[in-house]
């Protein structure tokens, strides 16, 4: 196991969770719909919990915890588009944008899991558990989106 590579992989997931928290904070503020506000708050909480776990793992490896978001790249552009979308208050469009963001988060988890040889068993299990929770969130968003589009 390459410790520096482990730290980098864990920090990649911290950043995607930071992005997710910021995106859903924006969504929660901008949407007028109570059920979506609750959903977005819960998704923020999931990513905040993930971030804390990941940061602890980085610290145990004597690494420096990444605090930022990806100010460049696809995920940031998604959230900027998302903010513009939600100001129109179209439930289906909001949820469609959320699903896209969840896809990007899951892609990042898959990318890290593709390099599992650089992770301890403990960190691998944590990442798999976090990914499973994001998959649950994705399913919720997709279901609500499909209902809104009908």
Annotated model-derived regions:
Residues 13, 20, 50, 57, ...:
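Amphipathic alpha-helices that form helix-helix packing interfaces
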Residues 11, 37-45, 69, 96-99, ...:
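Short, charged, amphipathic alpha-helical segments
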Residues 94-150:
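Preference for long, well-ordered alpha-helical segments
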Residues 52, 59-88, 92-93, 100-106:
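Carboxylate-rich helix-loop segments that flank metal/cofactor sites and access channels
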Residues 50-58, 87-88, 136-148:
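Amphipathic alpha-helical coiled-coil segments
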Residues 2-31, 93-117:
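Alpha-helical bundle segments that constitute or directly flank the non-heme di-iron/ferroxidase center
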Residues 27-31, 58-61, 86, 113-117, ...:
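Secondary-structure edge/capping motif, primarily at the C-terminal ends of alpha-helices
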Residues 34-64:
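Acidic (E/D-rich), amphipathic helical modules within compact regulatory domains
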């Amino acid at each position: 196991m390459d410790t520096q590579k482990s730290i980098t992989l864990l920090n990649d997931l911290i950043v995607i969770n930071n992005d997710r928290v910021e995106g859903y904070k924006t969504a929660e503020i901008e949407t007028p719909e109570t059920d979506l506000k609750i959903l977005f708050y819960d998704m923020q909480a999931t990513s905040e919990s993930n971030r804390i776990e990941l940061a602890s793992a980085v610290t145990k490896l004597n690494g420096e915890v990444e605090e930022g978001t990806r100010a460049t790249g696809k995920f940031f552009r998604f959230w900027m588009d998302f903010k513009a979308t939600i100001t129109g208050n179209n439930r289906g469009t909001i949820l469609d944008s959320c699903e896209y963001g969840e896809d990007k988060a899951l892609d990042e988890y898959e990318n890290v899991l593709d390099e599992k040889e650089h992770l301890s068993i403990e960190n691998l299990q944590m990442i798999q558990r976090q990914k499973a929770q994001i998959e649950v969130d994705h399913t919720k968003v997709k279901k609500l989106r499909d209902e809104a589009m009908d």
